[in-house]
Design a protein with these regions (language model features):
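Mid/C-terminal beta-alpha module of Rossmann-like enzyme folds, strongest
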Residues: 237-302, 321, 326, 331-343
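NAD(P)H-binding glycine-rich loop region in Rossmannoid oxidoreductase-like domains
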Residues: 60, 64-117
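Active-site Tyr-X1-5-Lys
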Residues: 163-190
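Substrate-positioning beta->alpha
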Residues: 121, 205-206, 222-242, 249
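NAD(P)-dependent short-chain dehydrogenase/reductase
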Residues: 183-231
Length: 345
């Protein structure tokens, strides 16, 4: 649906700019650092002062506090159309990293609204403002499902709506449909589907929770398998894709497939703490999520483990990352080496 824009959208700036949504999250904040290091003029969307402080802390972690002051911040919400209009003035390229991540079933409506409707709004503004290219940071959760014939999941693996998926996965898949809709309407787009992204600066969200849990003495592990990648490699790949002539493609981004046990042990070694000792078998995880449901339902504690995330912890999902190497010359850093680097050991 075409947007009806208010006022004069042709305000003159000295230089065209790059817009980053989700600039207060792990990927978006790292993306801001790399863009500014490359001399780009950058605008970022934020929703609260507290969220901006997390990004400021990350710049300090990398000793680039000087660059933080060069960001043009716009207070906006991807669900609020009037605030987005100002954010898109004089923008040429858009990195859409904003997303709501939760595996609490009670957040289903908020997840779908933010991730699908919010992405639809971004796509509509890109079309209305004549954006040259949109890069959307999706997830391997939005890729298809392995089966008896196709054991390794890739960009071409078919999504099966009949199979159970987490609300987050469904929302990311729906968001991708909005991006492809924009492509059909004339917008040049790119989609990247990273695995579990590891990186510093956000200990209480995303993969940072793994480091925090191990540091606090996490006692159990699971033997599920999935793809992992360093945040710096996600950012470098995204930058190279945006700067290239590549368009209307989708790429799985992982360094390799690892078991959760391997990653948790590596984190424990890097932090010089005890490794998780107890194997939580699938039946145990099924009990855990039911206990978690009980505590939430009757004692009003926030959900920490949904049925979908419990299943993911013991599912062996393996991903094919070969497509991106056919388009770009990249060598990803070993995730295990990266874990030691960001842990300071």
């Amino acid at each position: 649906m075409a947007l009806q824009l208010r006022g004069n959208t042709k305000k003159k700036y000295l230089y065209p700019m790059i817009l980053v949504t989700g600039g207060t999250g792990l990927v978006g904040a790292h993306l801001l650092i790399h863009l500014l290091e490359n001399g780009k003029s950058v605008r970022a969307v934020y929703r609260s002062i507290a969220s901006k402080e997390k990004t400021k802390h990350l710049f300090s972690y990398y000793h680039r506090s000087d660059l933080f002051e060069k960001i043009e911040w716009i207070e906006a919400d991807i669900l609020d159309i009037p605030s987005l209009e100002k954010a898109f003035e004089n923008i040429e390229f858009v990195y859409h990293c904003a997303a709501l991540i939760s595996f609490d079933p009670k957040d289903e409506e908020a997840i779908r609204k933010t991730n699908i409707e919010g992405t639809a709004n971004i796509v509509n503004f890109c079309l209305a403002f004549g954006i040259k290219k949109l890069l959307f940071v999706s997830s391997i959760a939005a890729l298809g499902d392995s089966n008896s014939v196709e054991k390794i999941i890739s960009e071409t693996t078919e999504w099966n709506p009949e199979k159970p998926h987490s609300d987050y996965a469904i929302s990311k898949y729906g968001a991708e449909m909005e991006v492809w809709r924009g492509q059909q309407e004339g917008l040049d787009v790119l989609i990247v589907n990273p695995g579990i992204i590891l990186g510093p600066g956000f200990p209480n969200q995303g993969s940072g929770v793994l480091f925090t849990a191990v540091a606090k003495g996490l006692s159990f592990y699971t033997k599920g398998t999935t793809g992992f990648i360093a945040v710096t490699d996600v950012v470098e790949t995204s930058l190279k894709l945006m700067d290239s002539a590549i368009k209307n493609e989708r790429f799985t981004l992982i360094e390799n497939n690892y078991s959760f046990q391997e990653i948790l042990n590596c984190i424990a070694d890097s932090l010089q703490v005890k490794k998780p000792q107890w194997h939580a078998a699938p039946i145990v995880m099924k009990v855990f999520w039911r206990i978690d449901w009980f505590l939430n339902t009757f004692l009003f504690q926030k959900r920490k483990l949904s049925r979908a995330s419990a299943k993911a912890s013991y599912s062996e999902s393996k991903y094919d990352n070969s497509k991106i190497s056919k388009f770009l010359d990249l060598k990803y850093r070993s995730v295990k080496d990266y874990i030691h680097t960001i842990s300071g050991n």
